[in-house]
A protein has these predicted regions:
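Intrinsically disordered, low-complexity regulatory regions
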Residues: 1-107
Length: 107
C-alpha cells in the first residue's frame, strides 16, 4: 500500500472509530457525564481498578484478532475490521483512564 493510500485509509478508520466511540459510549455511561463510568462501576462491583476492567474488554477483542491472524477466519458476525476498531478504541479509553488517574495523583 502506498503511503498516501495508507493515510487515506487510516483517516477513514479513525473517523469510524470516533463515530463508534460516541454511539457505543452512550449505552455504557448510563446517562452519566463520566466517560469511564462503566469501567469504574464494574470495577467497584468486581474489586478491580477501572484500568483492569478496560484491559479485560480489550483482551477479548485481542483474542478475536489473534484468532483471525492465526487461522484467517472470522468466527463471529462482526468483521475483523470492527474488532480492530474496537480494540483501538479500548486502547484509547485505557489511555484516558490512566491519564485521568495520573492527573488526580498530581493534584
Amino acid at each position: 500500500m502506498k503511503v498516501k493510500d495508507f493515510f487515506k485509509w487510516s483517516d477513514k478508520m479513525q473517523k469510524e472509530e470516533n463515530r463508534l466511540m460516541k454511539v457505543k459510549g452512550e449505552e455504557y455511561t448510563v446517562s452519566d457525564q463520566d466517560k469511564f463510568k462503566n469501567f469504574k462501576s464494574i470495577g467497584e462491583r468486581m474489586n478491580l481498578d477501572a484500568e483492569q476492567v478496560c484491559l479485560i474488554y480489550l483482551l477479548k477483542h485481542m483474542d478475536s484478532i489473534r484468532n483471525y491472524v492465526l487461522t484467517g477466519s472470522e468466527v463471529s458476525e462482526e468483521p475483523i475490521t470492527g474488532r480492530i476498531q474496537d480494540a483501538r478504541n479500548y486502547l484509547l479509553l485505557l489511555g484516558g483512564i490512566i491519564y485521568e488517574k495520573q492527573r488526580k495523583e498530581t493534584e
